[in-house]
Amino acid sequence: MSSFKHLSVNQLVQMTEAKSVQIVDIRDGNSFNNGHIDGAFNLNNENLAHFIGQADMDRPLVVVCYHGISSQNAAQYLCEQGFDDVYSLDGGFSAWHEANA
């Protein structure tokens, strides 16, 4: 079983420019609707099984939360579900928003 990796905001920018990447945002729906990384999917308990069933397990997957803490647990869980290349965004959406404001 693989383990997730940490990813900085700069690395995420490079990754999105270089290859096809899946981004899941685990923040609550209101926070997601108020702002999120382009192309991100709002992953929650209600749509988790559907997402796992439809997702490309071989594409890089970046997990985003508020500050980069909760995303680590979610990233590890997704590794355990069979995703091969999983990342947790250090600093979360807050860091991404600050870097892109």
Swiss-Prot record:
EC number(s) reported in the record: 2.8.1.1
GO biological process, one term: glycerol metabolic process
Keywords annotated in UniProt: Cytoplasm, Transferase
GO molecular function: thiosulfate-cyanide sulfurtransferase activity
Cytoplasm keyword on record: yes
Active site, per annotation: 65 (cysteine persulfide intermediate)
Enzyme class: transferase
GO cellular component: cytoplasm
Catalyzed reactions: thiosulfate + hydrogen cyanide = thiocyanate + sulfite + 2 H(+); thiosulfate + [thioredoxin]-dithiol = [thioredoxin]-disulfide + hydrogen sulfide + sulfite + 2 H(+)
Residues covered by the Rhodanese domain: 17-101
SUPFAM superfamilies per UniProt: Rhodanese/Cell cycle control phosphatase
Localization annotation: Cytoplasm
InterPro entries linked to this entry: GlpE_sulfurtransferase, Rhodanese-like_dom, Rhodanese-like_dom_sf, Thiosulf_sulfurTrfase
Function: Transferase that catalyzes the transfer of sulfur from thiosulfate to thiophilic acceptors such as cyanide or dithiols. May function in a CysM-independent thiosulfate assimilation pathway by catalyzing the conversion of thiosulfate to sulfite, which can then be used for L-cysteine biosynthesis.
Family that this chain belongs to: Belongs to the GlpE family.
The protein, known as: Thiosulfate sulfurtransferase GlpE
Annotated gene: glpE
